[in-house]
């Protein structure tokens, strides 16, 4: 065998092998590689999308927490304002009640003083009549007595 023939035969066998690989093996292999590349690309896109969604979710969580804090602070401020209103209303009510009780006590004191004065006047008038009676050694009639007492009470 001649070396040229061997090289020629090997070249034909190699060309046949290249043709078989290029027509029968290479297209399905390329197809599988492309499918794998597409799956990897889809996976990377899904991962990117997941990262974006995660970032959006975290932003929404931050906004929600911020809103919740603001709402809580607002509720606390309203509660403090309401407590202040209740305290002020209670103070005003206590002052009103104190004034009312003071007025009632003042009226009661004045009424008691008036009763005591009237009683004292009656007692003084009786003592005065008894003293005058003893001095004059005679009795004064009731009408004259009443008239004198009324004049005396008016002067007092």
Curated annotation (Swiss-Prot):
Keyword Transmembrane part of the UniProt annotation: yes
Subcellular location, record wording: Cell inner membrane
Family to which this protein belongs: Belongs to the ATPase B chain family.
Segments traversing the membrane: 3-23
Alphabetized NCBIfam families for the sequence: ATP_synt_b, PRK05759.1-2
Molecular-function annotations in GO: proton-transporting ATP synthase activity, rotational mechanism; proton-transporting ATPase activity, rotational mechanism
Purpose: F(1)F(0) ATP synthase produces ATP from ADP in the presence of a proton or sodium gradient. F-type ATPases consist of two structural domains, F(1) containing the extramembraneous catalytic core and F(0) containing the membrane proton channel, linked together by a central stalk and a peripheral stalk. During catalysis, ATP synthesis in the catalytic domain of F(1) is coupled via a rotary mechanism of the central stalk subunits to proton translocation.
Keywords: ATP synthesis, Cell inner membrane, Cell membrane, CF(0), Hydrogen ion transport, Ion transport, Membrane, Transmembrane, Transmembrane helix, Transport
InterPro entries from the UniProt entry: ATP_synth_B-like_membr_sf, ATP_synth_b/b'su_bac/chlpt, ATP_synth_F0_bsu_bac, ATP_synthase_B_chain
GO cellular component: plasma membrane; proton-transporting ATP synthase complex
Subcellular location, principal: membrane
Domain of life according to the entry: Bacteria
PANTHER family per record: ATP SYNTHASE SUBUNIT B (PTHR33445:SF1), ATP SYNTHASE SUBUNIT B', CHLOROPLASTIC (PTHR33445)
Protein name, entry field: ATP synthase subunit b
Subunit annotation: F-type ATPases have 2 components, F(1) - the catalytic core - and F(0) - the membrane proton channel. F(1) has five subunits: alpha(3), beta(3), gamma(1), delta(1), epsilon(1). F(0) has three main subunits: a(1), b(2) and c(10-14). The alpha and beta chains form an alternating ring which encloses part of the gamma chain. F(1) is attached to F(0) by a central stalk formed by the gamma and epsilon chains, while a peripheral stalk is formed by the delta and b chains.
Topological type in the membrane: Single-pass membrane protein
Pfam families per UniProt: ATP-synt_B (PF00430)
């Amino acid at each position: 065998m001649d070396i040229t023939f061997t090289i020629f035969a090997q070249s034909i066998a190699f060309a046949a092998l290249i043709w078989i690989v290029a027509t029968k093996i290479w297209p399905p292999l390329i197809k599988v590689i492309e499918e794998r590349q597409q799956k990897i690309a889809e996976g990377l896109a899904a991962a990117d999308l997941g990262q974006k969604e995660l970032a959006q979710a975290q932003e929404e969580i931050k906004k929600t927490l911020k809103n919740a804090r603001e709402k809580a602070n607002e509720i606390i401020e309203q509660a403090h304002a309401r407590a202040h209103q209740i305290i002020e209303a209670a103070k005003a009510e206590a002052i009103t009640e104190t004034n009312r009780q003071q007025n009632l006590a003042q009226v009661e004191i004045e009424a008691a003083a008036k009763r005591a004065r009237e009683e004292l006047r009656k007692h003084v008038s009786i003592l005065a009549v008894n003293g005058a009676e003893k001095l004059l050694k005679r009795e004064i009639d009731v009408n004259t007595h009443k008239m004198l007492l009324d004049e005396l009470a008016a002067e007092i």
